[in-house]
Design a protein with these regions (language model features):
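Short beta-strand/turn micro-motifs at beta-sheet edges
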Residues: 1-3, 66-70
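Vicinal oxygen chelate
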Residues: 1-7, 10-19, 37-39, 49-54, 70-136
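Core segments of cupin and vicinal oxygen chelate
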Residues: 8, 16-58
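Short beta->alpha connector loops
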Residues: 42, 65-66, 87, 110-112
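Short, charged/polar, Gly/Pro-enriched secondary-structure boundary elements
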Residues: 55-60, 123-127
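Acetyl-CoA-dependent GNAT
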Residues: 63-68, 131-134
């Protein structure tokens, strides 16, 4: 058997469609402080935006296909979870979203409500800001 690829050094792109690139960009850029890392328009019928933080090991890509409806998140448990162990940093992140009119929603899994707040993006996908650390 071949040795598996060493994915621990890979850069992760989380990509999904959206029906409203402007609204989803505002949510992640203005609400969560992401930067626009790249954009494209009408590339083989697709337009998109990549959002993230320069130097980070991940970024998000949102695409819109001309003539196709992406629809809303398939469940209330489709999550991106950001662990923010520093209480002041967590409070700033929550306040930033709330200051833009985004209200927390009750998490589908009550675990996330114990130390975090859950927000829905414009497509119904959820983002958890968890006031805890993550240790593997």
């Amino acid at each position: 058997m071949d040795k598996p690829a060493n994915l621990d050094k890979a850069h992760l792109r989380v990509a999904r469609p959206s029906d409203d690139l402007l609204a989803v960009t505002r949510f992640y850029r203005d609400g969560l402080g992401f930067e626009i890392l790249g954009e494209f328009e009408d590339h083989d019928g697709f337009s998109g935006v990549m959002l993230g933080h320069k130097g980070s090991a991940y970024h998000l890509e949102f695409t819109r296909q001309r003539g196709h409806e992406a629809g809303r998140a398939p469940t209330e448990d489709n999550l991106l979870v950001f662990y923010l162990p520093d209480a002041a940093e967590w409070n700033r992140a929550v306040a930033r979203l709330e200051g833009l009119g985004h209200k927390p929603v009750k998490a589908f899994n009550p675990y996330w409500d114990k130390k975090g707040k859950t927000f829905e993006d414009p497509d119904g996908y959820r983002v958890v800001l968890q006031n805890a650390s993550w240790a593997v």
